[in-house]
From Swiss-Prot:
It comes from Saccharomyces cerevisiae (strain ATCC 204508 / S288c) (Baker's yeast). ATP binds at residues 566-568, 765, 813, 815, 818, 838, 1034-1035, 1114-1116, 1167-1174, 1202, 1208, 1232-1233. This is Probable phospholipid-transporting ATPase DNF3. The keyword Heme does not apply. The gene is DNF3. Component of a flippase complex consisting of DNF3 and YNR048W/CRF1. Interacts with YNR048W/CRF1; the interaction is direct and required for proper expression and endoplasmic reticulum (ER) export of either partner.
């Protein structure tokens, strides 16, 4: 017990609240039995229905606080140890402490607030229940995701501002400056600007937080219905129920429907006449008889003890104790996807004793009970409490335990239940989801700020050094020239030591610019707006643009090393799709949803049948989304009445148009409208599984001939009596029978008369039932044990047939059994019962009647799979070693083969090799074609591609197929050369064949002998399972068994006894189920796709290429997480997956062994999978945690499943703390991701369909995961480069300018005199050098976005801090110092020592000033800035021209005749001297020339990655490839609606033809390119988009996807360079990691044509 007690953190609460203790004890092998409330709860029948993943949830935990939480645990009243000073500090700093009561919180369950018991527990003033810990009312239900309060903003912001070292430095200087007699520049010239600049920064931060407050207000003001028993009601407060509840206040459950036996589960049949008038949902009865009204309250107004009424699809506003509900068996379902990431619905039940009281209206109105619950805590998976009811018979109090099945938490959604009444037990910040959020999120600061602070420290040291140096010079000159009355006219006056030193410090202190941070704030505001205005990151479906809520850390978007992503709703689309199935040894693709997916949103929005560009073309077709109703499109694809070639499908002209659709309602239900049709089954090309399927598996290259359900249904309709057709129909029937879905017929006229809503707690079953409907087996109704199915025996166009099946028993699925069974009495088999079982492949295979054969085949498949994966891994390792040798053979030999996977950021090996290869080429020639050739040579030798991995897969599977041909004979379908032999005679069947297309189907199916060959079917089925699993699909194996009626009845008695047993019920039920689930016959396999969002796989692959490690942290179960890992390519086919569990005997040895293997380079790709229970164990052991973190930093990826929100935050914090220079990014969409988002350096929220919880607290929000690519690779890189260049240019100009002051002191005996005129000196940073640094900080783009997206390896520039570091800073300091020396000394020599007109301070300073202003402007805008445009020229003209105007205006400001002759010197003296102008010109040009020569020499000798690709992207052929590679990311911006005249003016400019101003001419010209009315592109080759120009123009130019016109290479030039550059296109395609297929001209032309259409 000592060990267990040591694990407890809240030992005196109602329960320990330490579920880590249970896990730790379980891990340590504790066997002593303790009786706890949870054990009692599990022994009762009322504890809730069996949940598939309950055991997994009980093992998962996360009882810890992330490091940012400031949490203090006290028991009893806080007044004892909670001092007044601590309270004040907590209020000011907005710190939150957690206190605990001695025996839990006691809450009366009373609807009548006038009852004596309620008044005793409530305050007299407002009637709110009292929190015993504070003797104050419980907190309200307001939540706050903002970072500051009214009281905490000022102290926290002052801390944040003075953490910027420059502000601290200037504050000290300002204090010294205000000391009388010390300052020579005024008293308040530093403190006032400092306060203004800090005020601007604080105002911007206040505005950002104000927006968060505004979003909080939106959620806090949501309405909810509250039951109130009060005679005085305000009519305006009465809550209006949803129409669905008003129309059917008494929703009939399955049991009620069985009693009334209606023909359908129809809402209209659930009328007032069928329900119990005393039921709680008779709201009229509650109102009229019991004076219970439904009031509308805002969420924030809810208090503990309120009775909340929820209706279907409502969000749960607070943590509620269930009182009653109208679901079947008093059961309700909640979706907790936003809470813990689980996709399956959870079953919840009110306590049976409590439900007895509140089920009736009278009981609900008059209930008087009490509940004692635990104090607020972070444990999402456990709950403990006591229900106290009074026994009126003997006046005793009965206590009943409450468990997690009796409560529903905030962040959940009520599903499949009409009405629920619950009482608030935790509100606001004390709810579970808010307790898991960080209570005191830290103020985020960029990593670059730390470097800036160090540089400022260095500059302070420099200022102090040169100030002391100047003072030393002053002392020496004073002794030499002033002391001993040598300068008698000064009367030996001395200012003193301190004033003299301070004068130098004040003169030099602006080397550190005072406006540094405020200028950076202005730049970052513009940067954030440019991100928000990016149309490529706009999600049209949800109308969600990119939103920047924090401008402070913009540059960190370009430095990310780790990405932590949620799964549900972030990577996935929250949809389960029935994608593939295997039947009798042949695999089939179910692609019914591909033509009607949400990807058509843009097309449906305009209601036009338009073509959209695909991510990958197939078989020469570039159709990605096609409306099947467009016959023109079908004609172009060949689906018309024209003769059908081999391999093509028949025409759809005779098929009725599809009108079926599916409307998903979360993961709980789907409304299916319309009847099945052949047109609905018709899909696009076979290989298009979904957006992400194109990169799911390399096996597609071999499996591209897979047939679809369209082909299968057509075959069944043509040959209904064939053996395969009979088995297929039986398989479809099994899909429709073996499930627990509830069909509900709806009669919403707007939906359609044939619409049926399927409700299920499992999204997988929802996908199976909808697939059965697609295939012609419609689950129509369920009444008691009768399941009605509508079939179409004569085809979808024929008359439907209703069949009734009696469901005798359900054997439910759970996490131990991993299978589900249903026993059915078939209509035509009265003496037999059909058992249909579905489950995991290993579970079903070991229960087949020939299990030995299945086991042998499974072993063979496993061996083959292992050999294939080993071959793939070996290929990857060889490629990596070759890559390392090419970079640096000697250096890499001394380092680990896996050093690129360590936590220390490293450069891309591919780019290093490219640079080395190009440098070797450059030593001989600068031929660009040889540059490309060198890149291609490098990639061909060492770079892995999907085709090479695919070739390994194909070779392995072809070898297996060859063995099958040798074993089963040449008439097997995979041979493809022999006609299969079915029951129908060959000659007869050949006469019935109309097309060769039928032959392909028959060859795919195989002969009857093969279909009946059990060994063959099992082998092919296991092979299909392997292929499906590799693609990341969730597989289920179906099996069946016929049972004699007598055998069934005997078993049913035993099964009934097990279900009614009072002891060990669960074990006995499982044993009885296992008894009947034996000796099964294999039926088929289904593969369900957890649909990823568009572009997720491609995005993750590019993220990996960028050198960013991606982790997936999810609350879902392990199997689901691993499947998604395969789907999104987080786990490769050849990956070594290391699973860490609490059952591992020596887990630390296991982790060390894996770490050593990774270090040795023997693992090609390593992924660690860990669950929440194991993480909880690691938390209690620092040694385990340190070893685990070290292992994770070496692996390629980590998947953490069953993770609580706090555990997600802990994982992020642990990695963030390993290296302070690493930048972490967390992305999620739900409330369970808030803590993770706040813990990371950068938090990105997905503002999607499931609410704005994560988006509200995030730093940046986007609509889809794929937008992360442009956010990081383009805007992140630009922001990092702009900020770095701004910092460098700022320090450069300050050092260049103020070092001239130091040099000039030698000519003034170090007197502290300034070289420059005071007004000019004060305006230097404001008027003459602010624009160039602002422009480079706002608009710098070193490379084009298409280059950055196509070559993600370039992202390492920011990740490795190559844009701003000490080396680069010192390089700029040396350049600035050199220029200062050149300018000042040459000025003295050329003007000061030779001028006869005026060689005083004023002209010397004027020449210096002119040269420095010109140098800074030209260097910033033309030397350092890559995208030179009109803004660069404008800023230079304004700055330099403004300085000249200023010089002319200075005499007006200084109109008095003084020795310092400003008033007349320029016009009357040196301004007329040609030497002055020549000196100014030479000093302005010479430093600029030296800078240009230095930069050119550097680019030629040591080119950076940016230099290489900046040159390559200027070439037309390379730009074309780059645009094609980035088309999917930039398509929206390129194809967005634009002004047609823009393209007209552009083409006029390129073609050098006269511009026309006639609108009619422009309209005619545009109409000749494309048609705006119907949105269709004219593909006619006769169309000339160059208007009235000659055909030579169209032959000379082509249009890129971006709309840019480029010249076509001439045929003569192309042929002459065929030997050298003929393969440049192919080579560059490999380099840029474009799709693996060859980019054919017709594909490019289709992109161009679509681009021309979208330019309208």
């Amino acid at each position: 017990m000592g060990i267990a007690d040591g694990q407890r953190r809240r030992s005196s609460s109602l329960r320990t609240q330490m579920f880590n203790k249970h896990l730790y004890d379980k891990y340590r092998g504790r066997t002593d039995d303790e009786i706890e409330l949870e054990d009692i709860n599990e022994s009762k029948t009322f504890s809730g229905s069996d949940n598939n993943d309950k055991d997994d949830r009980d093992e998962t935990s996360g009882n810890y606080a992330a490091e940012e939480d400031y949490e203090m645990e006290e028991y009893g009243s806080p007044d004892v140890s909670y001092s007044i000073i601590t309270k004040i500090l907590d209020t000011i700093l907005d710190r939150r402490r957690t206190f605990h009561s001695k025996d839990g919180r006691h809450i009366p369950i009373i609807l009548d607030h006038n009852a004596i018991e309620y008044k005793q527990a409530a305050t007299k003033r407002d009637g709110h229940l009292i929190d015993e810990r504070f003797n104050k009312p419980y907190c309200d239900n307001r939540i706050t995701s903002s970072r500051y309060t009214f009281y905490s903003f000022l102290p926290r912001q002052l801390y944040a501002q003075f953490s910027k070292l420059a502000n601290t430095y200037f504050f000290i200087v300002a204090v010294l400056q205000m000391i009388p007699g010390w300052s020579t520049t005024g008293t308040y010239t530093t403190i006032i600007p400092l306060c203004v600049f800090m005020g601007i920064s604080m105002t911007r931060e206040a505005w950002d937080d104000f927006r968060r407050h505004r979003l909080d207000k939106e959620e806090n003001n949501k309405p909810v219905g509250v039951l109130v028993k009060d005679g005085n009601n305000d009519a305006q407060e009465v809550y209006t129920l949803p129409s669905s509840v008003v129309s059917s206040t008494a929703y009939l459950t399955k049991s009620a429907a069985a009693e009334n036996n209606p023909p359908l589960n129809d809402d209209r049949n659930s009328s007032q006449g069928h329900f119990l008038d005393t039921h709680f949902n008779n709201f009229e009865l509650l109102k009229n008889k019991y004076n219970v009204h439904i009031h509308q309250k805002k969420w924030e107004k809810l208090r503990v003890g309120d009775f909340v009424l929820l209706t279907q699809d409502d969000w749960v506003p607070a943590d509620l104790l269930l009182l009653t509900c109208d679901g079947e068996n008093s059961e309700c379902f909640v979706e907790t996807m936003a809470l813990d990431g689980e996709t399956n619905l959870k079953s919840k039940q009110p306590h049976p004793e409590l439900n007895k009281l509140t089920k009736a209206a009278s009981g609900l109105a008059n209930i008087n009970a009490q509940v004692t619950v635990e104090d607020p805590n972070i444990d999402l998976y456990n709950f403990e409490g006591n229900l106290e009811l009074k026994n009126h018979r003997n006046d005793t109090i009965m206590k009943y335990p409450l468990g997690p099945d009796n409560v529903i938490y905030r962040g959940s959604i009520l599903r499949n239940t009409q009405n629920v009444v619950g009482m608030v037990i935790f509100s606001g910040e004390e709810t579970k989801i808010r307790m898991n959020a960080l209570k005191n999120p830290r103020t985020k600061a960029p990593k670059l700020q730390r470097k800036i602070n160090m540089i400022i420290v260095f500059m302070v040291f420099v200022v102090a050094t040169i100030s002391l140096f100047s003072y030393l010079g002053h002392v020496l000159h004073k002794k030499k020239y002033i002391d001993q009355n040598k300068a008698w006219y000064l009367f030996q006056a001395d200012a003193g030591v301190a004033p003299t030193i301070m004068s130098f410090i004040i003169m030099y202190n602006t080397v550190i610019p005072l406006s540094l941070y405020v200028t950076m704030e202005i730049i970052k505001v513009v940067q954030s707006k440019m991100m928000e205005w990016d149309i490529d990151m706009y999600h049209a479906e949800t109308n969600t643009p990119c939103e920047s809520r924090t401008a402070t850390i913009l540059e960190e978007l370009g430095q990310v090393s780790y990405i932590f992503s949620d799964k549900t709703g972030t990577l996935t689309d929250n949809k389960m799709i029935f994608r593939k199935f295997s039947l009798c040894g042949s695999s089939w693709l179910h692609n019914v949803d591909l033509g009607n997916s949400e990807d058509n949103f843009e097309d449906n929005r305009d209601n036009t049948n338009s073509l959209r560009l695909p991510p990958k073309a197939h078989n020469g077709s570039s159709i990605d989304v096609v409306s099947i109703g467009d016959q023109n499109v079908l004609d172009r694809l060949g689906f018309s009445d024209a003769p059908i070639e081999k391999g093509h499908r028949p025409s759809l002209d005779n098929f009725p148009k599809s009108r079926n659709s599916i409307e998903y309602k979360g993961n709980s239900s789907a409304i299916y409208t319309g009847r099945p049709s052949m047109r609905s089954l018709f899909g696009k090309d076979n290989s298009h599984l979904s957006k992400q399927a194109s990169v799911i598996s390399p096996s597609e290259t071999f499996s591209e001939n897979i047939k679809s359900s369209f082909d299968l249904i057509q075959f069944i309709q043509r040959y209904p009596t064939a053996l395969f057709s009979q088995k297929a129909k039986f398989f479809f029937l099994s899909l429709a029978l073996c499930h627990s879905c509830l069909p509900k017929k709806t009669h919403n006229e707007s939906i359609g008369e044939d619409s049926i809503e399927y409700q299920s707690s499992s999204p997988d079953e929802l996908a199976l039932v909808t697939a059965a409907r697609d295939l012609g087996y419609i689950v129509l109704n369920r009444n008691a044990q009768i399941l009605t199915i509508k079939t179409f025996p004569d085809g979808f166009d024929g008359e439907a047939k209703l069949e009734n099946y009696e469901i005798l028993n359900y054997i439910d699925f759970n996490s131990q059994r991993k299978r589900m069974s249903v026993l059915v009495r078939m209509p035509n088999q009265p003496n037999q019962v059909l058992l249909i079982c579905k489950g995991a492949d290993n579970v079903i295979m070991e229960r087949l009647h020939d299990r030995e054969l299945a086991a042998k085949k499974m072993a063979d498949i496993c061996t083959s799979t292992k050999e294939r994966k080993d071959a793939e891994a070996e290929l990857v390792l060889q490629q990596r070693k070759s890559l390392e040798r090419m970079v640096d053979e000697e250096a890499m030999a001394r380092t680990s083969l896996r050093n690129s996977l360590s936590s220390v950021p490293r450069a891309s090996l591919s780019l290093q090799a490219v640079r080395k290869s190009l440098s070797m080429k450059n030593s001989r020639t600068r031929d660009p074609e040889k540059q490309i050739d060198s890149i291609d040579q490098f990639l061909e030798t060492v770079k892995k591609s999907d085709q090479e991995i695919g070739s390994v897969v194909n070779k392995s599977r072809k070898s297996l197929h060859k063995q099958q041909i040798e074993k089963y004979g040449p008439r097997i379908s995979i041979d493809g050369t022999h006609f299969p032999n079915n029951n129908v005679p060959i000659d007869t069947r050949k006469e019935g064949l109309q097309h060769d297309y039928d032959t392909e189907i028959l060859e795919h199916i195989g002969s009857d002998e093969l279909i009946l060959n059990e060994e063959y079917v099992i082998e092919r089925t296991l092979q299909a399972i392997d292929e499906f699993s590799t693609e990341g699909l969730r597989t289920l194996v179906y099996a069946y068994k016929w049972i004699d009626i007598g055998q069934y009845e005997n078993w049913n008695k035993r099964y009934h006894q097990a279900k009614t047993s009072l002891t060990d019920r669960k074990i006995k039920v499982d044993e009885a189920g296992a008894e009947i689930e034996d000796g099964l016959n294999l039926l088929g396999v289904t593969a369900i796709e957890d649909k990823l969002q568009d572009g997720v796989s491609e995005a993750i692959e590019k993220i990996r290429r960028a050198g960013i490690k991606m982790w997936m942290l999810t609350g879902d179960k392990r199997e689901t997480a691993i499947n998604i890992g395969y789907s999104c390519m987080l786990i490769k086919d050849y990956s070594t997956v290391v699973i860490l569990t609490t059952t591992d005997e020596n887990i630390i040895s296991k982790m060390n062994a894996v770490s050593q293997e990774v270090d040795s380079g023997n693992i090609a790709h390593c992924v660690v999978v860990i669950d929440g229970a194991t993480m909880a164990m690691f938390e209690g052991n620092p040694t385990y945690m340190s070893v685990f973190v070290e292992l994770c930093t070496k692996t390629d990826s980590v998947i953490c499943c069953r993770a609580s929100p706090s555990q997600k935050a802990l994982m992020v914090s642990n990695i963030r703390n390993t290296d302070p220079n690493l930048v972490t990014l967390a992305i999620g969409d739900g409330a369970n991701d808030i803590a993770m988002i706040q813990s990371a350096d950068i938090g990105v929220g997905i503002a999607g369909k499931e609410g704005l919880q994560a988006s509200r607290v995030s730093d940046y929000s986007i609509g889809q995961f794929r937008f992360l690519l442009k956010l990081l690779f383009v805007h992140g890189r630009y922001n990092y480069i702009r900020t770095s260049k701004f910092m460098l240019c700022t320090f450069y100009k300050e050092i260049t300018f103020y070092f001239t002051q130091l040099i000039y002191q030698r000519y003034t005996m170090f007197s502290g005199s300034s070289l420059y005129e005071p007004w000019s000196l004060s305006m230097f940073n404001t008027l003459f050098t602010s624009l160039p640094v602002l422009c480079i900080g706002m608009f710098e783009k070193d490379l084009k976005p298409m280059t950055l997206l196509t070559v993600p390896e370039l992202y390492s520039y920011g990740r490795l801090s190559q844009g701003f570091n000490w080396l680069i800073f010192m390089e700029w300091v040396i350049l600035a110092t050199t220029n200062s020396l050149i300018i000042t000394f040459l000025n003295v020599v050329m003007w000061g020592m030779s001028s006869l007109s005026d060689n005083t301070m004023y002209p010397l300073g004027l020449i210096n000033f002119t040269a420095i202003v010109a140098l800074i402007n030209v260097k910033s805008q033309f030397v350092e800035m890559h995208n030179r445009n009109w803004l660069a020229f404008t800023s230079v003209v304004l700055s330099c021209g403004g300085w000249l105007v200023w010089c002319c205006a200075l005499p007006i400001l200084n109109n008095t005749d003084q020795i310092y002759d400003v008033a007349y010197g320029f016009y009357n003296h040196f301004g007329k001297d040609i030497t002055f102008w020549c000196t100014s010109l030479v000093l302005a040009l010479l430093p600029i020339t030296l800078d240009i020569v230095y930069k050119t020499f550097k680019v030629m000798i040591w080119p950076s990655d940016s230099d290489i690709f900046a040159e390559l992207e200027q070439k037309s052929d390379i730009r074309k490839k780059l645009e094609l590679g980035a088309y999917s990311e930039m398509r929206q911006g390129w194809t967005w609606d634009k002004d047609p005249s823009t393209f007209t003016r552009y083409t006029d400019k390129v073609l050098s033809r006269p511009r026309t101003n006639s609108r009619a001419s422009a309209k005619t010209h545009n109409s000749s390119i494309y048609s705006m009315s119907n949105g269709n592109v004219d593909h006619s080759s006769k169309k000339n988009f160059f208007g009235n120009s000659s055909k030579k123009s169209s032959e000379r130019y082509e249009v890129l996807p971006s709309g840019k016109l480029i010249k076509r290479p001439s045929l003569k030039t192309q042929s002459s360079k065929d030997s050298i550059g003929g393969n440049i296109t192919t080579k560059l395609t490999k380099k840029l990691k474009l799709p693996s297929r060859n980019v054919e001209d017709e594909d490019v032309n289709q992109i161009i044509q679509a681009r021309l259409k979208d330019l309208e």
